[in-house]
Amino acid sequence: MISENLGENQTEKIPLKGRTLKELSEIMITLGEKPFRAKQIYHGLYVNRYETWDQFTTFSKIFKEKLEELCSLTHLQVVKQLKSVDGTQKFTFTSESGNGKEFEAVWIPSGDGGRKTICISSQIGCTLNCKFCATAKLEFQGNLKAHEIVDQILQVEKIVGDKATNVVFMGMGEPLHNYFNVIRAASIFHDPDAFNLGAKRITISTSGVVNGIRRFIENKEPYNFAISLNHPDPKGRLQIMDIEEKFSLPELLQAAKDFTRELKRRITFEYVMIPGVNMGFENANKLVKIAKSLDCKINVIPLNTEFFGWRRPTREEIAEFIALLEPAGVPILNRRSPGKDIFGACGMLASKS
């Protein structure tokens, strides 16, 4: 486990951000240090939010010089920051190596100031081609490492001067195609000795990677889970989501049922509303049948990426569709779309300004 993300050659420093406490302990032992040093570093990184070895004032000069030589506190570079009229802020990052690969995170405060969500990315670009998502139009440039995922939170919170109450893996990329690094980062967010976010305040989303869902179930991951459904019919779903070719809707729904049965937790279906594509009575009726078959809630989201040739539904169309879903007897949320003016809303992350 220690060798994960060490770099391409032995001359590169060991990145310490994005490591669990257990991993840090193993690294310290490898470096000939006592395991308790790991807890000091862990606390310094995630509680005190130190960014340089000089800030670890309890460390001896010799120990700090050793860490400086062998280990890295690498952090992301913010190359662009945009603020919406509604208070949403979008951050475009690149890694410290300056490789030019950009990815984004979004700070989303609620209107009353109580809920503060950070939407983070798990990949640069995406491996999938969802027709309603701007990220799908980007070239896939790789998975983000755990320290690059964790540092999105650290950098955003530092800049806005506030702490997030919720974290959602709904930015660029398919989280379950980067399972190891996503779960490692989520465990750090959840750890009481690090970010101390409750498991119910961390949501991992997927477009429907069934083998990843089954791995999630097998590992009994404690986090909230959302599936980007977007169409209640296999043929219709295939037209807008290419993942349907690999993991069919029946397979996906069976995995969702297994999730609720095994983990005893409600699953969330995300549903981007596209007029003429997945709305109307017939689609609503099929979605109601799906919802009745398992313990779930439905988040409906008006289409934001109008530049794909579709239009955003009107308020009347949204209200009518939600009314058609009410017989399902499950919670239905019309999810707001903050940050549209800065291309920070759902489906719009593509390093655009």
Swiss-Prot record:
Reaction proceeds by a ping-pong mechanism involving intermediate methylation of a conserved cysteine residue. [4Fe-4S] cluster binds at residues 126, 130, 133. One of its GO terms (cellular component) is cytoplasm. Its cofactor is [4Fe-4S] cluster. It catalyses: adenosine(2503) in 23S rRNA + 2 reduced [2Fe-2S]-[ferredoxin] + 2 S-adenosyl-L-methionine = 2-methyladenosine(2503) in 23S rRNA + 5'-deoxyadenosine + L-methionine + 2 oxidized [2Fe-2S]-[ferredoxin] + S-adenosyl-L-homocysteine; adenosine(37) in tRNA + 2 reduced [2Fe-2S]-[ferredoxin] + 2 S-adenosyl-L-methionine = 2-methyladenosine(37) in tRNA + 5'-deoxyadenosine + L-methionine + 2 oxidized [2Fe-2S]-[ferredoxin] + S-adenosyl-L-homocysteine. Residues 112-341 form the Radical SAM core domain. The active site is at residues 104, 346. It is found in: Cytoplasm. HAMAP family: RNA_methyltr_RlmN. Its main location: cytoplasm. GO terms for biological process: rRNA base methylation; tRNA methylation. This is Probable dual-specificity RNA methyltransferase RlmN. Keywords: 4Fe-4S, Cytoplasm, Disulfide bond, Iron, Iron-sulfur, Metal-binding, Methyltransferase, rRNA processing, S-adenosyl-L-methionine, Transferase, tRNA processing. PANTHER family: 23S RRNA METHYLTRANSFERASE, RADICAL SAM CORE DOMAIN-CONTAINING PROTEIN.
